[in-house]
Amino acid sequence: MRLPHVLQEQFLSLARPNTLKNIETCGILAGNLKNNVLTITTLILPKQTGTSDTCSTENEEDLFEFQNKHDLLTFGWIHTHPTQSCFLSSVDLHTHCSYQLMLPEAIAIVCSPSQTPNFGIFRLTDPPGLDIISTCRAERAFHTHPDKPIYTDASDTGFIEMINFDVNVVDLR
């Protein structure tokens, strides 16, 4: 999967007003498949609500309409952790599970501007992570999961290639 180097910087710039208020911001990573390569070409910020440790999209039909009109596939999502470290919370794991069930290559990017490291690219392991999260029936938003390697840093696997090209930014908020 190819990601533009400027993605994090542009996303954090758009998220900055929320980050200063300790509110998470999320975006959708979209692009195209050409010659067996997934390329993220577009960052879409949908209408959303956020708190200090969650963000949720709203009016998803606007997002789907935009992607359909521009022939964009969904390759994952990106969000901030304004004051937390760079990891996938239990809520993030469940959010990402739906993306990875639809597209096994889907990624989740976490930006933690006040921490080091401040940027991570993650995927659920398969096995065991995808099975564990997809069958989890815990009712509380934040909860524990078995102490197993549920997700991994996708940038360490050679799956991600960060290259220099522009990303189209669409703010639907």
Question: Model-derived features: where do they sit?
Answer:
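Conserved beta-strand-loop surface patch within small alpha/beta domains used
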Residues: 1-74, 83-173
